[in-house]
């Protein structure tokens, strides 16, 4: 998802994918386990220590922005891409699982995710249509590779091999995911999410 958004917005697709792969790795560390407020910050340090590009390391930290009401959005384009991808994934998965906010109950902070998503797109000047992003995210969330027919997996592997691409689980995953688009997402879910994000933005900018 991050790679696709990066490519569409003019950022580095490979770095977008790499940042997404590493974005939650620091949650497994003892440091973040003891001090949760350091998530992202420690991820940046760990990524830098591993020799990752500075843009990738910074994106892992800054993708959490805005962290609170009134906070700035992520400063770099790559971090904005990752911030958008993570919030899209959270919203699509949350609504897809029926975990919609109700009244004052929002245990998965989907309202905050929606506002952060909208603000990052607008204030970051990312020229990618919101509805298209939501459709793509919902389509990806609907994919369960365990349910993909074996012959389709074999076809994907054969196609990769024919193009000289190393055949591994990640490559097959990307090949299968690339065939899913808006047509695979529930239109009602897309409409609901679209309205949800716009509602949060109206309230924020009205204030």
Residue map of PLM features:
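Amphipathic alpha-helical "coupling" segments that flank catalytic cores
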Residues: 1-207
């Amino acid at each position: 998802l991050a790679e696709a958004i990066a490519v569409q917005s003019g950022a580095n697709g490979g770095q977008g994918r790499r940042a997404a792969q590493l974005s939650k790795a620091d949650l497994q560390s003892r440091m973040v386990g003891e001090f949760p407020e350091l998530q992202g910050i420690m991820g940046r340090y760990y990524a830098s220590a591993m020799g990752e590009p500075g843009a990738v390391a910074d994106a892992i930290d800054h993708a959490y922005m805005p962290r609170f009401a009134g906070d700035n959005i992520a400063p770099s384009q790559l971090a904005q891409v990752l911030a958008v991808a993570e919030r899209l994934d959270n919203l699509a998965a949350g609504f897809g699982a029926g975990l919609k906010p109700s009244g004052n109950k929002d245990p998965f902070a989907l309202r905050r995710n929606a506002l952060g998503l909208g603000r990052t797109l607008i204030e970051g000047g990312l020229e990618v249509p919101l509805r298209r992003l939501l459709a793509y995210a919902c389509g990806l969330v609907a994919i369960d590779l365990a349910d993909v027919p074996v012959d389709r997996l074999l076809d994907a592997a054969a196609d990769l091999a024919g193009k000289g691409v190393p055949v591994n689980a990640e490559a097959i995953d990307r090949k299968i995911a690339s065939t899913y688009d808006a047509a695979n997402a529930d239109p009602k879910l897309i409409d609901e999410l679209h309205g949800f994000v716009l509602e949060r933005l109206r309230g924020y900018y009205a204030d």
